[in-house]
Every structure is written in C-alpha cells, then in structure tokens.
C-alpha cells in the first residue's frame, strides 16, 4: 500500500535539511580554496591576469592553477629547480597575488595537493570539465596551464591523458623535462617551455639545440637574437604552444625582477 505524498512530511523535511547542510558545507570548503560559486571553479583561475587574457584575441581562453610556490605552503617543494634569482623575482605576489586572501587561498590549495591528493585531483578534473564546457559555449578553444606558480611534473599524475583534447602548457626549469619535450617524449597535448635562470644557461642552450624553446627574461628591449637563436616577444600572449620551435621567448623584467642582481635577468 502506497502512503500519500506529504509535501512537508518528515522525510521531505529531513532531505531538505540534509541537502541545505551539504550545499553550505561544500560552498564553505570551496570558498576557502578561493572558489566562487558563480565561477563554478574550485582550483583554476580564468582571466585572472592581463597576459593570459591576451589569448582571447587569438580565440583561446586560458585557465591557470596558482599554488603557493617553493615551500610557502609549509609542505613539500613545488619548485624543485628554482634558483636564487627566480626565487627573488617570483611573480607570486604580482597583480591579485598581492592580496592576503589570494595568497591564503593558494596556500590552502597547495596544502590540499599534499594532504589529500585524491580530493585535489577530483576538484581539478571537475574544473577542467567545467572550463572546457564553458569554452565550447562561447565558441572559444580551451588551454590550461597547471604550473602558474609551481613546477610540478603533471605528466606523472595522469592529468593530460584524462583530457586528450585539451591543450596544456607550462614553463619549467627542469632540464630533463624540457629535453623530453624537445625530443617528443611528452604527451602530445602538453607543451613545455624551458625557463632560463642565472644557474642553468648551459642547459638552456642544450634545450635550444635539441629543438626546444627557452624563456629568457631581459632587462629592457628584447634583442633580435640570443645565443644565436631568434627571439620572439613572449609578452604579446601566453600561448606558448603557438610558438615556432627553436626560439627564445623574450620576456621583459617585471616587479622585483627589475632590481635583479643575480644574473637571472639578462642585461
């Protein structure tokens, strides 16, 4: 015998309370990670800086994962090949990164990465799916940069294989990873640009000779060539996967980098 439906019966009241509590809990947790329910992204940022926004003119939308660099989250190292110069010139506090709440959100994301990677990965995958769906609705192409302020070997964590149709890209100071990319040993949907510092110029030249690209920070006007390789303007957009091979990606010094005395910035 079926019982008559009760709009405000005990079961209905219980489920309303349960779902209200669950939604409030989830919203609070995501807010602590820097999430806005209106953005519908947990970990990724879209349109958070001027440079990546320039890609829109080329038909691309960029989502970036910003973590707390180095060991600032009080966990493991996320920039294993950082030098003194790049540490001092780090753009971690540039733009919105200057705000305390933004830095705290990045710290919490990084702590989640180390403390509960399963949850972190689930949130990241949900973000990528939502971002791609949003791009499709807008008639834009999606690209994702996971190392906005970190240098993690994401190819070992199953991210790129899970989204074979999404273009991923990063900068890295790992010569091993950069050479792997130059030799075609990275996932086909992942583009990697090696970052020169004051302590890895020899490796940077090796990467260029192997067919890879290298980002170099210059103090003023970008030269036509560096170490015999053509220089392209890397400040015009952040779409590194559109660059030709065997080029130097010239970047003008910004923020603390303008006062560099380590050799990280090329005079």
Identify the meaning behind each predicted range:
Residues 19-22, 33:
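Replication-associated primase and helicase/ATPase modules
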